[in-house]
Amino acid sequence: MNRPHSATGDRPLALVDEHAHAWSPKTARARFRKGLTGPTAGVAAGHTQANLISVPADWAYDMLLFCTRNPQPCPVLDVTDAGSWTTVLADGADLRTDLPRYRVWRDGELVDEPSDVREHWRDDLVTFLIGCSFTFEWALAAAGVPIRHVEQGRNVPMYVTSRACRPAGRLRGPMVVSMRPVPPAHLSAAIHESSLLPAVHGSPVHCGDPSALGIDDLDRPDFGEAVYREPDDIPVFWACGVTPQAAVMASRPPFALTHAPGQMFLTDARDEQYRVA
């Protein structure tokens, strides 16, 4: 699978605002609607973030089945009616304008990365909102786990793996993972805290040697940006909601809209709503 060209290239993406952790989700969405872009890690503390993918209605069942068969990378939080750009997860939000950046796909090829997709919108699009691991970073931080990409003001690194997802109808593709370097003393806390939030990917799929996932070079992520790792840090990999984008690249549906990796939809839902005992 070829790495898609990004409009941002390899230049660092600063966090959207140094005070963004204190924003409400509504404030964040309003700023994104006005054109603010950038990774949303650390934005709107304590609120659930979501990946987005919109597909034509005649592909929606395949996508729903794909997510159902692959719940760790694709945990569904909401599915809209065809043509709807609203969601029960965020009152008054517009899914066409309220993310920092989107991706437009035609026949599996990335053709645009706008900050507003109203001109690309179609009445037959069904939108899936899928849980994002940025949500559990607050729990990790509260447990003392350093979040390296946030510390460094970078997007989280994401990698296409050698693990195939279960196919569904016309959709197939590999699992994508996000990686966070974790000091050994904090590894058990990272695993435990994330495991309590299965709706946003839950516990890691792998800790340690990246070659076990078919990843050759941690400094060359397929999406996002490489992060500096301390010498004793352990690379920890979580299933990632960019997996549907990898399925789009592999399966080549005629049209799809997605979020740009790392630039998520901010919901009004509190992370506690998805926390299990």
Swiss-Prot record:
Domain of life: Bacteria
Top enzyme category: lyase
Enzyme Commission code: 4.2.1.-
InterPro entries linked: D-Glu_cyclase, Putative_hydro-lyase, UPF0317
Any matching Pfam family: D-Glu_cyclase
GO molecular function, one term: lyase activity
Keywords attached to this entry: Lyase
Family the entry assigns: Belongs to the D-glutamate cyclase family.
NCBIfam families: PRK05463.1 (NF003969)
Name of the molecule in the record: Putative hydro-lyase SCO1412
Taxonomic source organism: Streptomyces coelicolor (strain ATCC BAA-471 / A3(2) / M145)
